[in-house]
Amino acid sequence: MNTMNIIDLHCDTLIKLHEQGCGLEDVQGHIDLDALRSGGALVQCFAVYTPTHEQVHKHKITTGPWEYFNTAADIFDREMEKHKELIRPVRCAADIRENMDAGRISALLTLEDGVCIDGKME
């Protein structure tokens, strides 16, 4: 029987980890490690959603958009290090193949909406 490798291009788990003060092993309401394993995930893209200034209090954010992006990236790095036997960050196709061969899930950090770059591409 062939199995399908799932590549999920978006989840809002990082903001939930920030709001809940938890880790990938116990986050409520979004992607967690058990769901990734049982769902046959090959790659999970973790979006950094940066709320607009009007929405920050709803998400327990007390810093500006750029600072929050860095906080979310730090959360991503922390979780990747904590669970490196199960999931590792990737930057290219070779990284995905390496993780797949080792039986690990690949994680890709992505940016949603770009509020944090404040219209500047430099």
Predicted features and spans:
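N-terminal hydrophobic targeting/anchoring segments and the immediately downstream early-domain regions
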Residues: 1-122
